[in-house]
Amino acid sequence: MLLFDLSGFTVTIFYCLLSAAVAATAYNALRVKSYSQAFNFRSHFHFDIMSYIGALGFFIDFVNRCVGIYNSIESTEYQSRLYFIVQCVACTAAFLSSLYLVAVGISFNDLNYDFRQLKVFRFMPLLWSIALILLVMQDAVSFESNVDEILKQILLVCGVCFFYRFASETLAQDNESAGRATVLFGRLYSYIAAVYFIDRLMLLFSQKTAVSDFDGIFSVSALLICTFVFFFERNIVANEN
């Protein structure tokens, strides 16, 4: 069943299942007392490739937002100057985040290069996530009739939490254990992004949205980014102490 079509009691069931899944994920992530360091470059998952996939996700979002900004200017329908500015910030942050993840991938290929020296870039994914939350907060949504939008907001909150932790990990000392919150929010972001993508894909197949739908393209971006996030978390667990 599409999240778009949920109503009444089925909405309650969905939120109960979502809460249970979040609780189970939190328990599983937090019960481990200590993880390995976040950036152990002995990757078990071709993490350089996963970083490039994540970079592609950010770049797709950058292009998607550029097109959206252009269309808004052409039609003079953008909501406000503040909305336009935040969209530009999100667009810029998406592009710089794409470059940043390329640098992450290079670091896992070339041990003589360390992306952690890019001190300003480490905050770009976090800035992107915050900008997206500011954008969605400008639209009123209902917990009962806008389940897919609520899921998107939860995804963005998890994104802020994860990329804050990711930036924090780049400041950690060598051999310092990765934070349990990093693993937790990495898993939550990955799982919710996958569910959100499936929902948008089902909307497309049911012909309730177009291929060029803004949120549909964003779901593709989120899926590619969550590929990077998921294998980042998996790499920490694989090297667990």
Task: Tell where the protein language model's regions lie, with residue ranges.
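C-terminal transmembrane-bundle signature of multipass membrane proteins
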Residues: 1, 12-24, 150-241
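Juxtamembrane "helix-exit" motif on the non-cytosolic side of transmembrane helices
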Residues: 1, 63-76, 133-145, 198-208
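N-terminal topogenic module of multi-pass integral membrane proteins
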Residues: 1-90
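Transmembrane alpha-helix entry/boundary detector in multi-pass membrane proteins
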Residues: 4-15, 79-92, 115-124, 137-158, ...
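Canonical alpha-helical transmembrane segments
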Residues: 20-36, 98-108, 160-169
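Membrane-interface helix-boundary motifs at transmembrane edges
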Residues: 34-46, 106-120, 170-180
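Alpha-helical transmembrane segments of multi-pass integral membrane proteins
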Residues: 48-65, 87-103, 119-136, 153-164, ...
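Alpha-helical transmembrane segments and their immediate juxtamembrane interface regions
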Residues: 93-110, 228-239
